[in-house]
Amino acid sequence: MILPNSTAVMPFLTTVWQGTVQPSSNASGLARRSPLRDDGKLEALYILMVLGFFGFFTLGIMLSYIRSKKLEHSHDPFNVYIESDTWQEKDKAFFQARVLENCRSCCVIENQLTVEQPNTYLPEL
């Protein structure tokens, strides 16, 4: 098996680099050069493609959300029960019964040793 020579690429890259760089300019001058007029067409196409994919993706999510909301309002017995007011009336009656039951079971037991006595002196800390 013959292993590839990775150093053989370096002279090729060097010649390509020297061909693009002008002899009188430095390496940072390439970054400051203005792009040619034909270079801007592909960037605009790329931006339009990204926006198109984003719009398509967003529209798909929005339509699936709307469709799922429509399915929630079907004639499913659970949804019919939730939409009806009977459970709210039953819940209100149950709550009132619980409050009355708790009020009836409440009582206060008075401890005669802890009842306030105006004649007794309580030292302050």
From Swiss-Prot:
Its membrane topology is listed as: Single-pass type I membrane protein
The source organism is Cavia porcellus (Guinea pig)
Instruction: Describe the protein's quaternary organization and the partners it interacts with.
Output: Interacts with KCNB1. Interacts with KCNC2. Associates with KCNH2/HERG. Interacts with KCNQ1; targets the complex KCNQ1-KCNE1 to the membrane raft.
Give a GO biological-process term: regulation of ventricular cardiac muscle cell membrane repolarization
Note whether Transmembrane occurs among the keywords.
Answer: yes
What are the protein's UniProt keywords?
Answer: Cell membrane, Glycoprotein, Ion channel, Ion transport, Membrane, Phosphoprotein, Potassium, Potassium channel, Potassium transport, Transmembrane, Transmembrane helix, Transport, Voltage-gated channel
Question: What post-translational modification information does the record give?
Answer: Phosphorylation inhibits the potassium current.
Q: Name one Pfam family in it.
A: ISK_Channel
Q: Which residues are glycosylated?
A: N5, N26
User: Is Transcription set as a keyword in this record?
Assistant: no
According to the record, the segments passing through the membrane are: 44-66
Q: What is this protein called?
A: Potassium voltage-gated channel subfamily E member 1
List the record's Gene Ontology CC terms alphabetically: apical plasma membrane; cell surface; membrane raft; plasma membrane; voltage-gated potassium channel complex
